[in-house]
């Protein structure tokens, strides 16, 4: 009986080990397949971008800026985004603006960033609105203006950016419009994460102070 038990245990251990090995092999294959797809996408975008395709240049710049399907490379992000921006891509204008705004691969230049974000907005890129709002709220490269910040945040809020919504709520809170601030803080889209945590905290503070 003891001998049979030992044999069964050995079989189970062997099966478990084989299962783990198979899973590791599958994970490696899956990772390799994903990497191949990512490499192929970047390769295809690069080929199109070199031929002057504006959309490909824009996407390639974004890929290098945010590390999408490739490693972050701010030099290449700037190179391809500038090419696309020169051809009128509003998204690319915003992306070049982000590089200057954050100082990614270049020296921070708020005036240059402001111009690029403004051009991006004029071209219809909604993402640039958030940055313009931030610049006016904090007085980065422009004279601080909560009215102007609220103006841009209001427009950007329609895109569903919860960070923008929180920033807008803080401006209303500072202005004493607690009802509007509460309304904005409550719009968390049902999320409970690091992005919405400041909204819940601000909401709790207002309720605790009897300003809800």
Task: Map each language-model feature to its residues.
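C-terminal motif of bacterial Sec signal peptides marking the signal peptidase cleavage site
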Residues: 15-17
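Bacterial signal peptide processing site
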Residues: 19-21
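Short helix-capping/linker turns of helical repeat alpha-solenoids
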Residues: 50-53, 66-68, 86-89, 102-104, ...
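Hydrophobic face of amphipathic alpha-helices that form TPR/SEL1-like repeat modules
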Residues: 59-66, 70, 93-102, 116, ...
């Amino acid at each position: 009986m003891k001998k049979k038990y030992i044999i069964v245990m050995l079989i189970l251990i062997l099966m478990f080990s084989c299962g783990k090995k198979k899973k590791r092999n599958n994970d490696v294959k899956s990772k390799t397949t994903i990497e191949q797809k990512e490499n192929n996408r970047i390769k295809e975008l690069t080929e199109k971008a070199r031929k002057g395709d504006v959309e490909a240049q824009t996407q390639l710049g974004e890929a290098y800026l945010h590390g999408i399907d490739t490693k972050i490379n701010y030099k290449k992000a700037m190179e391809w985004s500038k090419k696309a921006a020169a051809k009128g891509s509003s998204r690319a204008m915003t992306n070049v603006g982000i590089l200057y705004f954050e100082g990614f691969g270049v020296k921070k230049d708020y005036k240059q960033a402001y111009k690029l974000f403004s051009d991006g907005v004029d071209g219809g890129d909604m993402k640039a609105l958030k940055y313009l709002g931030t610049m006016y709220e904090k007085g980065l490269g422009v004279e601080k203006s909560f009215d102007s910040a609220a103006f841009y945040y209001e427009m950007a809020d329609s895109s569903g950016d919860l960070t923008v919504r929180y920033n807008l709520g803080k401006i209303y809170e500072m202005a004493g419009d607690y009802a509007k601030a509460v309304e904005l803080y409550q719009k968390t889209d049902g999320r409970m994460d690091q992005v919405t945590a400041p909204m819940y905290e601000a909401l709790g503070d207002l309720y605790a102070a009897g300003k809800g």
